[in-house]
Every structure is written in structure tokens, then in C-alpha cells.
Amino acid sequence: MNGYYPVMLKLQGCRCIVVGGGPIAERKVLGLLEAGADQVTVIALDFTPRIEELARGGHIETKARAYASGDAKAARLVFAATDQAELNRQIALDGEQAGIWVNRADEAAAGTFINPSVVRRGELVVAVSASGASPALSSRIREELARQYGQEYIGSTARLKELRERVKLTIGDRRLRSEVLKLAACEAPRQSEEDGDIDVWIERLIAATDRRNT
């Protein structure tokens, strides 16, 4: 029992606050934007050039000032990413008292959630965590997964999503539907968008499933 429950969060419309303006804070901001967060505020006395660039582009909001205890109450997620341990501790305490989820970049176990290492391929998201015990191990496994699940999975996942929606409308038999989707998941990484339209693919999958069952 490691005490962590894995979950995927939908961040659209969710206020996220990052306290800190250095490289660690920048990584947190980029991770949030990659996950679709659209309400990100960064609070610090100064910022990395990349954070400033994102603010100029309207992707995030920056507040060039010191952290105030009331800041955490305005968020759903808070990231304590400063280079001051005592300030990070106070941010985590403020979040805990307000019932807000807080991530401490300097001491993961002292926050209420941690960030896994992530591989993204379109809508495919593969996450791995060592529960804070060894970030280096998580990173190594992430690199292995990145090699195993290459860029081809971006198109594969998109096609599987389209196929699933079509199958739900066209195949009434639940068992057949399940078998078709499982077979499609096996085939998709070896296919490309030029391999034909979705309806033809469905027909071929149904025929292959029928042959398996006879």
C-alpha cells in the first residue's frame, strides 16, 4: 500500500495556480497546458523567458508579486514550485486548510498529490509513478514506454476513437461489439489513415471475428 490513488483529471475550466517562476515551475506550467488546462496563473517575483512568452501569448496569466495566503483558496489545484522550502511548506498548509489539492515540487510526500512521468501520443496517455520513491526510475520507465509507443499511436488512437463511436451505432450485439473493438486495438498501430475508411475497416473486423468464432 503506497497511499496514492491514480486518477485522470479534466482541467478545462479548472483554476490552476503555480507558485514560482523558475525552471521547475515552467515544467509544471507546460505539463498543465499539455493536459488542456486553460486557466493557469503563475505567481512569482520573476519568471523564466518561456513563462513570459506563454503569458504574452495569452496561454497563461502571470502575477509578478509574492505569494499571499489567500491565493490557494482561488484554485482547484496548486503547485508549490519555489526554491524556498519554508514557502512551499506554507503553500501546502494553506491548501490543506482550504481543502485544495497541492503539489510540492521539493518534497512530494508533503503535498496531497504527485505528478507521474507521462508519455502522450494524441489521446493516448501512459503514466508511471514510483510514488515519490525514485523519480529517476519513473523517468527511465517513461523513456522505455516512449520508445515502445511511438508517434504512430497518435493517428491510431484517433482512428480507434472514430471507429468506437461508429461501432456503438452500427453493432447492436454487445459481445460482437467487444470482440471487434479488441481486434481493432491490435490492428490499429500497424495501420495508417491511408488504409481505408472506417466503415470498410468495421466490415473487415466483423468478418475476421466471424471466422474466429466458426
Language model region names:
Residues M1-L54:
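Hydrophobic, well-ordered beta-alpha structural blocks that scaffold small-molecule cofactor pockets
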Residues G13, K73-A74, R121:
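Alpha-helix C-terminal capping/helix-to-coil transition sites in glycosyltransferase folds
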Residues P23-I24, E86, G132:
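Residue-level detector of alpha-helix initiation sites
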Residues A44, T62-A66, D106:
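Short loop/edge segments at beta-strand edges and connector loops
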Residues E53-K73:
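Glycine-rich, highly charged phosphate/nucleotide-binding loops
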Residues L77-D83, N88-N115:
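ADP-ribose/adenylate-binding Rossmann-like module
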Residues D83, R104-I154:
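E1/E1-like adenylate-forming module used to activate ubiquitin-like modifiers
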Residues G132-T214:
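An accessory alpha-helical subdomain
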